[in-house]
């Protein structure tokens, strides 16, 4: 029993390996990060279609899935662009200051952040949240592999507590119109030429 007790996972063995226990192949951090980004593409496609579909429901329109996809892409592409530009700026800045190679980890972070944001969010908030998530959530801890928080969720949490009206609720997830325009009760008789007010009231009643 003593030998079994000593071989448990809480104790280390006194045996030493003669060769490296790791498999060395072409799959490095860059390859893994790119695969993660590529695996998120279906999520973006579905999200774009859903954004267009929700907008068509809001406006009471009948649209195809291709039209919904185009509408969604027109909405999320600016968000993605701002996210990647902000992330690349901070990654390059910290890489130059610390004199270390640029890591591809920010690609995954910048690919995840737009998936957590509503479609109608202001682009300046996207830039601020991305900067907060990468700088405070990752870079101050030393970069890729040393952060204790998820940078994408740090960006989401930052927006939730600083701009709750733009990040929470049901209305922010649909591209609703700012307002409706239509004739008012006073504009209808005002548009009549040579009309009698009494006759208009009698007609309306």
Region annotations inferred by a language model:
Residues 1-5:
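Short, small-residue-biased leader/transition segments that mark boundaries at the very start
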Residues 13-32, 65-69:
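Cytosolic juxtamembrane amphipathic/interface segments immediately preceding
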Residues 17-23, 87-99, 134-145:
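C-terminal ends of transmembrane helices
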Residues 36-49, 84-91, 115, 131-134, ...:
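Hydrophobic core segments of alpha-helical transmembrane domains in multi-pass membrane transport
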Residues 42-109:
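Membrane helical hairpin/interfacial module
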Residues 100-109, 127-128, 147-156:
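Cytoplasmic-side transmembrane-helix entry/capping segments in multi-pass membrane proteins
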Residues 109-119, 136:
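Generic transmembrane alpha-helix motif of multi-pass integral membrane proteins
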Residues 145-205:
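Long hydrophobic alpha-helical segments that form multi-pass transmembrane helix bundles
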């Amino acid at each position: 029993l003593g030998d079994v007790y000593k071989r448990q996972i809480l104790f280390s063995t006194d045996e030493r390996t003669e060769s490296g226990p790791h498999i060395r192949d072409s799959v490095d951090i860059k390859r893994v990060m790119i695969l993660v980004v590529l695996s998120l593409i279906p999520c973006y496609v579905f999200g774009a279609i859903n954004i267009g579909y929700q907008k068509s429901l809001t406006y009471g329109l009948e649209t195809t899935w291709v039209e919904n996809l185009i509408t969604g892409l027109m909405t999320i592409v600016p968000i993605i662009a701002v996210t990647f530009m902000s992330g690349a700026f901070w990654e390059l800045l910290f890489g130059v200051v610390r004199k270390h190679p640029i890591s591809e980890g920010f690609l995954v972070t910048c690919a995840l952040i737009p998936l957590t944001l509503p479609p109608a969010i202001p682009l300046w908030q996207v830039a601020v949240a991305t900067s907060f998530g990468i700088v405070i959530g990752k870079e101050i801890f030393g970069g890729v592999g040393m952060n204790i928080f998820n940078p994408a969720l740090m960006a989401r949490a930052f927006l939730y507590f600083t701009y709750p009206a733009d990040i929470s609720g049901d209305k922010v997830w649909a591209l609703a119109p700012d307002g409706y325009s239509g004739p008012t009760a006073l504009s209808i008789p005002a548009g009549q030429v040579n009309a009698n007010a009494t006759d208009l009231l009698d007609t309306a009643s």
